[in-house]
Amino acid sequence: MIKCLALIFLIAMTATSGLTNARQRLDDALIAVGLDSAAPAPSASPAPAPDNAATNDATACDGVTFTRNLKYGDHQLNVLDVASAQAPGAKRPVVVFVAGDTFASDGKTSAKSPLVEQAMCFAGRNGLVAFSMSYRLAPAAPWPAGAKDVAAAISWVHENADLFGGNKEEIIPIGYAAGAFHLASFLAHSEFQESDSYVAGAVLVSGIYRPDSDPGEAEKSYFGSDASKYDGQSSLPGLTRIHVPLVVAWSQVDAQRFVAQGEKLKDTLCGAGHCPRTALLSKASSPASVFDLDGASADLHDRLRQLIGQIDARGLP
């Protein structure tokens, strides 16, 4: 199956040159700030990381280089990781994972998600350049900090995608859980976007798109306790005015509010003449669902392949 998917993604590649020189520019830049461009990357089934691990948290992902902790902003959480294969002469589509299970910090240091790592490894092996971003958390960074961080990260990717063989015209962010809200907010609120934060499409998985009327403590920490402001913080109106293609997915075993919000987003977009591609997952969703690494997300993987094909076809005569 993986070989078949590799062929599908490789078909989506477009020709370019100069990756070797770009890689040297990247290495020089990383050395200048004390970083190593060749940090280890994960296998398909990484072992648990030791407590004191920072970036050396997994074994090798054959054929893929992971570059860690690239700063896109001033905060310690404003960092990106990237996974890319050494493929001179090719500009590849770019995916950016915006994945997070919560809106607020619990005061502990969060480990890198092994599911995101696996998805990045798979993407790098199959004709894509994959980034993952972390972002600021409430209560220190309330709404709209998440959306602004997405904008800053996408802007950084625009400026630097070529260093990893990526095509800045084919950037597809993938938001999961709380990250789906931040990505949706970025898309829906043009005032949070930056001049070079254009995306070619987006994938939203198991998110909320309007604060609940009775939010939990983490959401209240991010959105505030004044429910009269929640409509203004909603992504639903703004998403009807964007022109990039969307994929919206949720799981049939998600909490009911996630199912309801996914269905509401779909209905709202279709009512505005901007129907998204949708996928209903049979198991609990995860960042790895976009590549069907859980064996239960073939529909979502198909939607992503269709989206990449649609975006790639725009450059054809």
Q: Where are each of the predicted segments found?
A:
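Short beta-strand/loop motif that positions the catalytic acidic residue
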Residues: 242, 248-250
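Short amphipathic alpha-helix adjacent to the substrate-entry channel of hydrolases
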Residues: 109-131
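Mobile cap/lid helix-loop segments that gate and shape the active-site cleft of serine hydrolases
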Residues: 59-62, 200, 207-238, 244
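Serine-hydrolase catalytic-loop signature spanning alpha/beta hydrolases and amidase-signature enzymes
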Residues: 102-110, 130, 156
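Primarily recognizes the serine-hydrolase "nucleophile elbow" in alpha/beta-hydrolase
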Residues: 152-218
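Short beta-strand element of the alpha/beta-hydrolase
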Residues: 91-102
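C-terminal catalytic histidine-bearing segment of alpha/beta-hydrolase fold enzymes
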Residues: 249, 256-259, 263-266, 270-317
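N-terminal cap/lid segment of alpha/beta-hydrolase-fold proteins
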Residues: 25-90
